[in-house]
């Protein structure tokens, strides 16, 4: 479990989560895979504990959980979903799951400060050990079309160009937990992990975001 420093900055070290937390995480991963019936494809890439940014399309509140649960346990332990603080702190159960089980990196969408931008929070939160799960569309979409990517992914990679970027396409999640619904409907989904990309030296923001979005779109069509 990642332990923040007293000032809320970078982690002070990597500690194994308590047995209860590990068991809870394993059970939730099994439940998520059962409800989604998720099949997992790795296309020209393999699971790895190196630092990565998994960037995916976003249609459901369950996206982060299902993607996280699709990773092998050793990779999952080192991967932090980026999540909305207002949603995941609304209630004790959500807060416990986000902070203790998923080790989520919570972003405050209501009070963004210049010295504490979401990108800076992510940079501090991963240090030189953790990977991230992000959704560059910036919010959930209601259909199958992948929206234009927001600029956060570009600025994250500009500050950490060494990070390996893995495109991910999550299929059918908007039908498992439609927008506005509370209970999931058991259906089959597929999670496709694509080949890694990197921000190239001098690559313009618009070109990079278009290329990253295209990497996810190709997985959808494949």
Predicted regions and their residues:
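Catalytic core of membrane glycerolipid acyltransferases/transacylases, capturing the structured
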Residues: 46-111
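Alpha-helical membrane-targeting segments
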Residues: 14-37, 90-103, 177, 181-186
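N-terminal/domain-start segments enriched in small and hydrophobic, helix-friendly residues
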Residues: 46, 62-63, 69, 114-147, ...
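Short coil/turn segments at beta-strand junctions that form active-site/ligand-binding loops
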Residues: 50-51, 77, 128-130, 163
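Helix-to-loop junction immediately C-terminal to a conserved catalytic motif
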Residues: 20-21, 28-58
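Soluble, non-transmembrane catalytic domains of enzymes that act on hydrophobic metabolites at membranes
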Residues: 1-8
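A cross-family acyltransferase "interaction/gating" segment
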Residues: 5, 96, 131, 143-206
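Short beta-alpha junction loops
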Residues: 84-88, 138, 170-174
